[in-house]
Amino acid sequence: MKKYIVLTILFVLPLVVYLFFASGINHFAKLPVLTNDVYDISKISNTTFINKITILGFFGKNIKDKHGDALNLNQKIYKRFYKFNDFQFVMIQPDGTEELTNQLKNELKKGTNTDLVNWSFVTISDQNILDVFQSLKTDFNLDLNFGTPYVFIIDRDGK
């Protein structure tokens, strides 16, 4: 009799627990909208936030220190979603960082074997970087190199 009780517990209990958790419904929380008026960079570059889901980042002048961050973003987010037509990564860089940006792109291509078709590195003046960042209206600040470890999600409407 004990044998049947033990076998029942070992077989039925895990099955019941599995069915309980499998029947659950995921209700993901919506992200808060920080601002409705993000500065559209199409005024100063060929890239736009409109009709694109954008991951916006500011690596700053010290791009060499951000290679790990770029690799993590590439592996955790970009690789899953880059085939969507309305998805893009936009990294805003200060003037004069073009060579370092190209090194980062080459390292991402070589190290991860990823198609960087939806990565955009936009090089603009320091004042324009401040304008774009301040339009996000966050509690975060840019460092002295005009960079931040945080990235921001901008939806199709530019919010």
PLM feature segments, named:
Residues 45-74, 87-92:
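Short active-site neighborhood of thiol/selenol oxidoreductases, capturing the structured segment around
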Residues 2-23:
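Hydrophobic membrane-insertion alpha-helices, especially the h-region
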Residues 148-159:
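A short, hydrophobic beta-strand/beta-hairpin element that forms part of a small beta-sheet core
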Residues 85-99, 116-128:
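Thiol-based oxidoreductase modules, predominantly thioredoxin-like and allied folds used
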Residues 67-77, 100-107:
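Well-ordered, non-membrane alpha-helical segments in soluble/globular domains
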